[in-house]
Every structure is written in structure tokens, then in C-alpha cells.
Amino acid sequence: YSKSLPLSVLNP
């Protein structure tokens, strides 16, 4: 990932 993690990864 670039800088910020997408929330979809933390909340499938």
C-alpha cells in the first residue's frame, strides 16, 4: 500500500 490503508482491508 502507498501511505494510507484502505478501510476495506481492515473491515472485510
Curated annotation (Swiss-Prot):
Record GO biological process: defense response to Gram-negative bacterium; defense response to Gram-positive bacterium
Alphabetized UniProt keyword annotations: Antibiotic, Antimicrobial
Residues annotated as signal peptide: none
Protein's job: Has bactericidal activity against E.coli ATCC 29522 and S.aureus. Inhibits growth of S.marcescens and B.cereus ATCC 14579. A synthetic peptide has antibacterial activity against E.coli ATCC 29522 (MIC=8 ug/ml), S.aureus (MIC=64 ug/ml), S.marcescens (MIC=32 ug/ml), B.cereus ATCC 14579 (MIC=64 ug/ml), B.subtilis (MIC=32 ug/ml), L.plantarum ATCC 8014 (MIC=32 ug/ml), B.flexus (MIC=32 ug/ml), S.enteritidis ATCC 13076 (MIC=4 ug/ml), Enterobacter spp (MIC=32 ug/ml), B.anthracis (MIC=128 ug/ml), B.licheniformis (MIC>128 ug/ml) and L.lactis ATCC 11454 (MIC>128 ug/ml).
Activity under varying temperature: Active between 37 and 90 degrees Celsius. Activity is reduced at 100 degrees Celsius and absent at 110 degrees Celsius. Activity is unaffected by storage at -20 degrees Celsius.
Protein name, per record: Antimicrobial protein AN5-1
Noted pH dependence of activity: Active between pH 2 and 12.
Native source species: Paenibacillus alvei (Bacillus alvei)
Top-level taxon of the source organism: Bacteria
Remarks, miscellaneous: A synthetic peptide has no antibacterial activity against S.agalactiae ATCC 12386, S.epidermidis, P.aeruginosa and methicillin-resistant S.aureus (MRSA).
